[in-house]
From Swiss-Prot:
A GO CC term assigned to this protein in UniProt: extracellular space
Family under the similarity heading: Belongs to the peptidase S1 family. Snake venom subfamily.
Gene Ontology molecular function terms on file: serine-type endopeptidase activity; toxin activity
Regulation of this protein's activity per its record: Inhibited by PMSF, bovine aprotinin (APR), and soybean trypsin inhibitor (STI). Is not inhibited by EDTA, beta-mercaptoethanol, and high temperature (85 degrees Celsius).
Protein name: Alpha-fibrinogenase A2
Keywords: Disulfide bond, Fibrinogenolytic toxin, Hemostasis impairing toxin, Hydrolase, Protease, Secreted, Serine protease, Toxin
Functional description taken from the UniProt entry: Snake venom serine protease that cleaves fibrinogen Aalpha chain (FGA), partially cleaves Bbeta chain (FGB) and has no activity on gamma chain. Is more potent than A3 alpha-fibrinogenases and less potent than A1.
Enzyme Commission number(s) of this protein: 3.4.21.-
Amino acid sequence: VPGGDECNINEHRSL
């Protein structure tokens, strides 16, 4: 799912 995974990665990067 392009977007959902990216969103998760972005959130993890923020943390």
